[in-house]
């Protein structure tokens, strides 16, 4: 089974629903494969990925398992990484031997912290696959759902990640087109995508837009204009410390724009649906991911650190026990054990309401 896999999606079971509907006229063997991580109940068991394909009724069908240590595809031409998948980094590492300079990876609506790690996931420049950021945009929906599974009106923006680390880039050039030998596999994998619906964006602009959306999302948790203004200023200071700040589009990063984005519209880059705004657990997971990104670039003297510390001392909120006065406690939000404790203790409360 593993030997015939050329194009596949790393994602949850439902990730291929839209793909299946668009390719229902094709023979089953020609439809894309869904690989999802299998939870292990024992550390002694060999990790495996569950293989799903589509039958004639477009219902996910479990057809096989792949043992990730002993069974792997020989070569993967095109790999789409859905933002809903878990264990993303470990899966990419395990499939690293199946990917080379002729392979293409499309990171669909992924967080900044994942593609920042791509250079360490694929350390050899000469064999590093082509890596693209894929950003879905809905045309008619007010909330951007997980596009690969349940959107009918969409547009896919692609931007190529530079082959050299971002801090060494002098300029982020525009990606004018997908390589001809890889574009067809991508469109075929995505089903009914037409060429007119695939745009090629300047990497600098796409990265800047994603960072802007990320900041706007975290600013939303604060209840008053004054707190949101302070949060916006603190995040702009974080951005100025990024080693690749020189290639960003500075027009995205103004306090006015961040505040406007956080108040008037949902974030466009993440797969954020209404459930995130009403589910405290989803909100906390997104906040954790953004802080994980920020903590790489700030120290205890920075405004964001001070702002979060002061805010949580004055706010009657579950976040107050997450953001402690020392940086080591900031890191605790990232640890699995600490997050599990928060889930148990606080997720029955409304963490979106911060009261001064």
Swiss-Prot record:
Mutant phenotype after disruption: Decreases mitochondrial respiratory chain complex III assembly. Decreases RNA level of cytochrome b cob1 and may lead to abnormal folding of cob1 protein. Abolishes growth on the non-fermentable carbon source galactose.
Entry's localization field: Mitochondrion
GO BP annotations listed: mitochondrial translational initiation
Protein keywords: Mitochondrion, Translation regulation
Keyword Mitochondrion part of the UniProt annotation: yes
GO MF entry, a single one: translation regulator activity
Principal localisation: mitochondrion
Annotated function: Translation factor for cob1/cytochrome b; plays a role in cob1 mRNA stabilization and required for correct folding of the protein.
Gene: cbp7
One CC-aspect GO term: mitochondrial inner membrane
Protein name (database record): Cytochrome b translation regulator cbp7
Assembly and oligomerization: Component of a complex, at least composed of cbp7 and cbp8.
